[in-house]
Amino acid sequence: MAENFHILLLNGPNLNLLGTREPDKYGNTTLADIVSELETQAQALNVKFSHLQSNAEHVLIDTIHQARGNTDFILINPAAFTHTSVALRDALLAVAIPFIEIHLSNVHAREPFRHHSYLSDVAVGVICGLGADGYQYALQTAVKRLSTSN
């Protein structure tokens, strides 16, 4: 049953500035708007949903470690840590919780240094370039995968 599932959303550095930061790339939707929409969607899907945004890599890693044993799926927009953080990758592998990597912009249509991800090859999937809607698609996919695997 979906009501037993817990899905954790993690957002990395600078995503607290959504809505005002480079709206041509990231849109005008704030992170609070995205989270509010996901909370509504999670309630409709009858799943527990929690969220954390941090600009600090160690906070995201500690949160991933704490998710072990009580979280069924992670949705993560690692932001700039996508391209730099082996530690974030190792944390996700260590807890063995399935996850979807999310990006608001199409990272493959941007600067070459953004084309590499330390997470995508170990993620269930990657959603990029679909703006805030990508988060909703990720949540729907996580619930569907959990529902069909149990």
From Swiss-Prot:
It comes from Pectobacterium atrosepticum (strain SCRI 1043 / ATCC BAA-672) (Erwinia carotovora subsp. atroseptica). The active site is at Y26, H103. It holds the Pfam family DHquinase_II. GO terms for biological process: amino acid biosynthetic process; aromatic amino acid family biosynthetic process; chorismate biosynthetic process; quinate catabolic process. Keywords: Amino-acid biosynthesis, Aromatic amino acid biosynthesis, Lyase. PANTHER family: CATABOLIC 3-DEHYDROQUINASE. Catalyzes a trans-dehydration via an enolate intermediate. Substrate binds at N77, H83, D90, L104, S105, R114. Coiled coil: none annotated. Its EC number is 4.2.1.10. The record marks R21 as: Transition state stabilizer. Disulfide bonds: none annotated. Homododecamer. Pathway: Metabolic intermediate biosynthesis; chorismate biosynthesis; chorismate from D-erythrose 4-phosphate and phosphoenolpyruvate: step 3/7. GO terms for molecular function: 3-dehydroquinate dehydratase activity. This is 3-dehydroquinate dehydratase.
